[in-house]
Amino acid sequence: MSAAVGTARRLTGTDFLAPERGPSAPGTAPAVASAWRVFAAQPLQVAYARRFVAGVLAGLRAADDVVLCVSELASNAVLHSSSREPGGCFVVRALVNGAGRIRAEVEDRGGPWDCDPGHDEEHGRGLLIVGGLATRWGISGGDAGRIAWLELDPA
């Protein structure tokens, strides 16, 4: 993803920021499966996002791990980003390349972000789950829009 995310327009309706991505690492194969979908920023929509990713990745060994990670990232978009404002949305993308590497992204409308839960907090561990399951992951963007992404290499 390019640094342009910070200056990108805000998501509206079915609009989304087209990712500017090349291969994740030198020598990676081109995409063989790619899909994206826009979801209303409502808690129930996180379940639909999980089903969407599960459908795109059906039959792949790492599908369950990616579905769990997308669930965590989509929940963050719904609960903690500006997407939660009236009419807000988030976008989920899933990509599988010819080498079997999976990439998933959740894009939201950005806004303030505090990713450091207190020691005694009951919530706020989703990114730790993503970090534990993903081969690589990260977050880019800021107040105008944010993309949380993860990659899993084939087992």
Question: For each predicted feature, which ranges?
Answer:
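STAS-typified acidic loop motif
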Residues: 36-46
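Short coil/turn residues that cap or connect secondary-structure elements
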Residues: 41, 57-61, 82
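Histidine-centered phosphotransfer motif of kinases
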Residues: 65-83
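Conserved beta-strand-loop-beta-strand hairpin that lines the nucleotide-binding pocket
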Residues: 1-36, 78-155
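Conserved short strand/loop->alpha-helix "switch" segment adjacent to the catalytic nucleotide/phosphoryl-transfer site
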Residues: 47-71
